[in-house]
């Protein structure tokens, strides 16, 4: 098991996104974020620019997928983990251009709770 004292968790996020206890939030320019990726030992990334940057830097990462698919947007260098099947029908009346709002509208969340989204043991094993 990994322990918090063994590593630092850097959370790349926008200023308007929630922060998490025990992490260092970083909201910086593209170059600074790419530098963080380049210097990092391990990476847990969502389907976003981070996994593209990691692939370009030849940094294998764990990438979590919910709305998009690694078949289309992923890189074979990564351990791509696809979300579990939905456990509830999401409210998608406000969806525009793609199935889910990239901002994370809670009404569109297709699970009863966050713990159902991914196989957490698979994610942990991927980071070992």
Model segments located where?
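Donor-binding and catalytic core of enzymes assembling or modifying cell-surface/extracellular glycoconjugates
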Residues: 4-71, 78-81
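Leloir-type glycosyltransferase catalytic cores
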Residues: 77-128
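A conserved mid-protein helix/loop that constitutes part of the nucleotide-sugar donor-binding site
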Residues: 1
């Amino acid at each position: 098991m990994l322990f918090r004292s063994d590593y630092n968790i850097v959370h790349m996020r926008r200023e308007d996104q929630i922060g998490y206890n025990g992490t260092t939030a970083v909201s910086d320019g593209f170059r600074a974020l790419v530098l963080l990726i380049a210097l990092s030992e391990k990476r847990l990334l969502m389907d976003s620019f981070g996994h593209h940057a990691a692939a370009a830097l030849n940094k294998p990462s764990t990438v979590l997928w919910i709305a998009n698919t690694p078949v289309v947007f992923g890189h074979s260098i990564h351990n791509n983990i696809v979300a579990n099947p939905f456990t509830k029908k999401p409210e998608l009346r406000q969806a525009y251009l793609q199935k889910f709002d990239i901002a994370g509208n809670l009404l569109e969340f297709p699970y009863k709770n966050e713990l159902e989204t991914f196989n957490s043991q698979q994610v942990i094993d991927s980071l070992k």
